[in-house]
């Protein structure tokens, strides 16, 4: 976390310099305000990471001699045979198409979205994949 903290603190210094130069040259308040807010966000994240790095044990990312495998852990669980993400993607595509074409397309996309969402959530609670 020390490296990430330093990275965000240096990023905030750069954003502050850009905000000052942009504000001086452009005289435009919206962009200048956005850059100063980005500076504030970066400095808050940087100091949070720096202070948190003091309280927790050093991770593999802080060791210069570390390998990639030192930080490796369980990635997570996924089901490669599932059709539910496809139905969710089709429902989402139809929903966004409904924004462009007409809101009436949402009537067709909402049931597909619900089937995909509930099917994906409850996939391992029914049928042959039931774990309990």
Curated annotation (Swiss-Prot):
The chain crosses the membrane at residues 5-25, 33-53, 88-108, 110-127. It is found in: Cell membrane. InterPro entries: Cyt_c_oxidase_su4_actinobac (IPR021050). This is Probable cytochrome c oxidase polypeptide 4. GO terms for molecular function: cytochrome-c oxidase activity. It is a multi-pass membrane protein. Its EC number is 7.1.1.9. Pfam families: Cyt_c_ox_IV (PF12270). It comes from the Bacteria. It is an enzyme of class 7 (translocase). Keywords: Cell membrane, Membrane, Translocase, Transmembrane, Transmembrane helix. Associates with subunits I, II and III to form cytochrome c oxidase. GO terms for biological process: electron transport chain. Part of cytochrome c oxidase, its function is unknown. GO terms for cellular component: plasma membrane. It catalyses: 4 Fe(II)-[cytochrome c] + O2 + 8 H(+)(in) = 4 Fe(III)-[cytochrome c] + 2 H2O + 4 H(+)(out). Belongs to the cytochrome c oxidase bacterial subunit CtaF family.
